[in-house]
């Protein structure tokens, strides 16, 4: 999965849920905050599907269980 597509999917889900979305750059990763949850995603062109799912799972407390499916 393209990293930009993963971030876009998270941003759209946050907007749909009425939660604040923030994207910020760190040294080698992009930080993402949805509501009160923070996570990072590597700054690569591609993010492996398994890694993207782990990132999505980290945000399910805010966005709801299985929101990415």
What are these regions (language model features)?
Residues 1-26, 33-69:
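Basic nucleic-acid-binding interfaces
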């Amino acid at each position: 999965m393209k990293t930009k597509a993963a971030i876009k999917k998270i941003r759209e889900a946050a907007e749909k849920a009425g939660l604040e979305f923030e994207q910020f750059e760190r040294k080698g990763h992009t930080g993402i905050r949805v509501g009160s949850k923070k996570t990072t995603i590597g700054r690569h062109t591609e993010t492996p599907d398994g890694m993207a799912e782990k990132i999505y799972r980290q945000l399910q407390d805010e966005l709801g269980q299985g929101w990415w499916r």
